[in-house]
Amino acid sequence: STGSLGVDLALGVGGLPRGRVVEIFGPESSGKTTLCLEAIAQCQKNGGICAFIDAEHAFDPIYARKLGVKVEELYLSQPDTGEQALEICDTLVRSGGIDMVVVDSVAALVPKAEIEGEMGDSHVGLQARLMSQALRKLTGHIKRTNTLVVFINQIRMKIGVMFGSPETTTGGNALKFYASVRLDIRRTGQIKKGDDVIGNETKVKVIKNKVAPPFRQAEFDILYGEGISWEGELIDL
């Protein structure tokens, strides 16, 4: 389960599918990490073991705890390079002892050559190559051990696009192909109590779904410091 009734329904299989790669992408502070932490909390509730690969070095244990994550039972890794992050992910998946791995985020998976290089050096296509190599290797292991791997991704603007959407996700095209489910998450409005903003209205679209019909959507509220609002969802549904 994702911790959101609406998203579980939109996914068509009652939650995120195991043994698959899932991509959750959206603009900054749209609720990507919140949705993943909610899913981790649900997985742990059912006795699952979860890992969080924090390439952004932005994991907040206090917030995670508020969302119901058992932080002391969570495998947390803060790798230095993209290679290291994906190697850790592969090792965790191959072990067969982990139910769910979250990688936060693809944009922060910086290749070693880029970290060690000079500021002005050109490293075109390095990250895309890294992702496609890693996913080729990972997919088989994921299927075999029935692990769920979630990649969080950011949105970038393509320059000079005349028609079609100018938005693209980072890390090349490999993830688009290898992901069985792709979720597009957006903040659509604010929730106010008097004059104070207490949360965000959020919309999730299932852009790609290989395990159920795609293009369904869900709307829910994320309250600051609390996570997804169950009551709000029940009323809406």
UniProtKB/Swiss-Prot annotation:
Belongs to the RecA family. It comes from Neisseria perflava. GO terms for biological process: DNA recombination; DNA repair; SOS response. Can catalyze the hydrolysis of ATP in the presence of single-stranded DNA, the ATP-dependent uptake of single-stranded DNA by duplex DNA, and the ATP-dependent hybridization of homologous single-stranded DNAs. It interacts with LexA causing its activation and leading to its autocatalytic cleavage. GO terms for cellular component: cytosol. Coiled coil: none annotated. ATP binds at G26, P27, E28, S29, S30, G31, K32, T33. GO terms for molecular function: ATP binding; ATP hydrolysis activity; ATP-dependent DNA damage sensor activity; single-stranded DNA binding. The keyword Transferase does not apply. This is Protein RecA.
